[in-house]
Amino acid sequence: MSNVPTELKYALSHEWVRADGDGVYSVGITEHAQELLGDMVFVDLPEVGSDVSAGSDCAVAESVKAASDIYAPISGEIVAVNTELENSPELVNSAPYTDGWLFSIKAADESELDNLLDADAYLAAIEE
């Protein structure tokens, strides 16, 4: 069974969201998603300063098995990306909830977080 930290919010498309304060949220992919994808070989991240809409594809994770779109779980402006992934994409596999984060978003509308799942609901969704 996948590790699903209870302090995070989740999208059905397997992204997690962590509140960093001041309306900024870190985003990554779940342990379940990285297990399905396999070993990461490249992560194409969004441009800092770009605006993204909830549900829009904004990054790509490429593994030995497949390339998979990563979707913005909330709308807002990309304020940071994890540059460590340029040389170490495997961090997405080894530490998906910590060092393997992908990007940070300054939320345009924090009420969109209400559309995301808590840990129990996400676990139920992936176990179906």
From Swiss-Prot:
This is Glycine cleavage system H protein. It comes from the Bacteria. The keyword Cell inner membrane does not apply. The modification N6-lipoyllysine is found at residue 65. SUPFAM superfamilies: Single hybrid motif (SSF51230). It holds the Pfam family GCV_H. Its cofactor is (R)-lipoate. The glycine cleavage system catalyzes the degradation of glycine. The H protein shuttles the methylamine group of glycine from the P protein to the T protein. GO terms for biological process: glycine decarboxylation via glycine cleavage system. Transmembrane segments: none annotated. GO terms for cellular component: cytosol; glycine cleavage complex. The gene is gcvH. Binds 1 lipoyl cofactor covalently. Belongs to the GcvH family. Keywords: Lipoyl. The keyword tRNA-binding does not apply. The glycine cleavage system is composed of four proteins: P, T, L and H. Residues 24-106 form the Lipoyl-binding domain.
